[in-house]
Amino acid sequence: MAAPEHRTEKYARVSALEELLKDLNSNLAGANENYLKDSDERFTKIFLMGPHRSGSTLFLQWLANTGLAAYPTNLLSRFFGAPLVGAKIQQLLTDPRYNFRNEILDFNSEINFSSDNGKTKGALAPNEFWYFWRRFLPFDELDYLPGPELREKGDLAGLRDELNALANIFEKPFAMKAMILNQNIPELAEQFDKSLFIWIRRDPIFNIQSALEARKRQYGDINTWYSFKIKEYPQLKDLDPLESVAGQIVAINRSVEQGISQLPDHKKLVVQYEDFCRRPKYYYDEITRRVRDQDGLGGAAAPAYAGESSFSNTNIWRLEEYSSKDAAGAYERFQII
């Protein structure tokens, strides 16, 4: 088993909450099975891929705000073991269609564009939903398995059916982060006829800086590995922090590029974070076109775009331990390996 994490107090897990959720989800498992009867594939699943700290949280918050797709919320994440039950409860508590005389109006339905190491605030704000993914993936020391082994030991059919059923409950495409399978994209893609893989890339210099800053926030130093343990983890984990993170970003981008290379154009989209910040509507149009090409809207029309016209990106060098030139050099060294 992997070694225990030593998080800073702010990011430490709450053991009482973990136990409560484990008990709740275990007892709801049977009810969840009943909702799996409607798991035909009618809507597109939108998977966000790429390195951590590349802008994926902002992108998912933005996409959620457009109304095009449903997504895992902080409320839904509490039901990681019984998400179909959770989806029904979320509808009951938050969907205006089921509002009775304004009895329950306490849930925050607004989604802002702030986050902290991928974490958001608000019942209906997007959640990373990693506990859900791990139910189906037999990862241990590494967050990766060779394709044949993952197909044999994982429950990819179960993952497929629950995601299809979730989309059917919400009657929309379902969008979510899927970086836990950055290095197993073909195995995920083969589960769906209607899927869109979005590779979010960021200027690698600032991606490296942001990843190092995330280490410091999460663990109190820049030496401790942060995010999924990719297949290159054993070779990268004990390097100088800058080299470790640079190698991590290069390896992830390389894996995603290879993973989507065999997908048809209507099943993939490359998003450059800096360009997305300049013109988000362009990417909304690209997404909706691909979803329509898959007949992934269930016969409905895509909402007209009413979102942000632009975002400010955070590409300013702040790190004291290294310079931007150091980061560029480290990235280039791994690029040629």
Question: Would you name each region that the model predicts?
Answer:
Residues K177-M179, L188-E213:
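Conserved phosphate-donor/acceptor-positioning beta-strand/loop module used by diverse small-molecule
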Residues M49-G50, K177:
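The Walker A (P-loop) glycine that initiates the GxxxxGKT/S ATP-binding motif of P-loop NTPases
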Residues F43-K45:
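Pre-Walker A (Motif I) flank of P-loop NTPase domains
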Residues T57-L68:
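A conserved segment at the C-terminal end of the G1
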Residues P173-K177, V270-Q272:
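Short catalytic-loop micro-motif centered on adjacent basic/acidic residues
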Residues R53:
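Walker A (P-loop) phosphate-binding loop of P-loop NTPases
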Residues R78-A175:
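PAPS-dependent sulfation machinery
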Residues M1-D40, K216-I337:
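PAPS-dependent sulfotransferases, especially Golgi type II membrane carbohydrate sulfotransferases
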